[in-house]
């Protein structure tokens, strides 16, 4: 099981049918296929269990996991520039005149098409967890852009996907700032030794503290000077450590060894059974963490 490293969390804004049996057919229409000779990028669904299963969905306890794969052709700018300049120089010499901008733009397209079949490919995979019990969708990535791209693929596959980023009633950065100021986080959470503070003023500066006592006078002075905490490293019940961000995302998830080893009694040769057990364990823990976070941050914004 690929234990999630990050969480971009989204709320389903209205009820829709999300059943694995239906989704299996819907995702199949957008299954991943490699780039053709003239494709810059392709994205589609692959089995979350990799070569161990052909299924595009895996479901347990009302939780569904799916996996998107993306192939991108790598064409470094210097390579394009060099090929384009050579082509322009050749034509200008042959025609004894300077080419117009529109002609150069057209040549650039030709150069791209000629280079694409020889370009290297970069592959990436993004796991998505759908919590049908709590009406949440979690994407395992660190950037909103990547999460939105994956959600867009799911939306295209299903025909509709009404989701909004999970948001709190109170600004997250103000709650995090109060936790650091008081030296005490919400019940179940403990401050660790890392934070990022930003000034509310434009061009007011950013402070990144690592391996530092966040209750120290130095940090307090930054807060008194008007900075707010935009990222804060936290421990949840000595089970999961993570960095809480002011956009509602959770970064650098780290599950304790006791948790990760909980299913060690299952034979690793039985990949499907271990994957299922780890998935149930991980989603159960993260669902509880997210619920605790929502409560600790003052509750979810009313829709």
Curated annotation (Swiss-Prot):
Q: What is its main location?
A: cytoplasm
Q: Which GO terms describe its molecular function?
A: double-stranded DNA binding
**Record's keyword terms, sorted:** Cytoplasm, DNA recombination
The domain of life is Bacteria
What's one GO-annotated cellular component?
cytoplasm
Q: Name one GO biological process term.
A: DNA recombination
Q: Does the keyword Plastid apply?
A: no
Enumerate the subcellular locations listed in this protein's record, separating them with semicolons.
Cytoplasm, Nucleoid
PANTHER family with a match to the protein in the record: RECOMBINATION-ASSOCIATED PROTEIN RDGC
Mind telling me which HAMAP family this protein's record contains? RdgC (MF_00194)
What's this chain's function?
May be involved in recombination.
Which protein family is named in the record?
A: Belongs to the RdgC family.
> What's the protein called, per UniProt?
Recombination-associated protein RdgC
Please tell me the species this chain comes from. Shigella sonnei (strain Ss046)
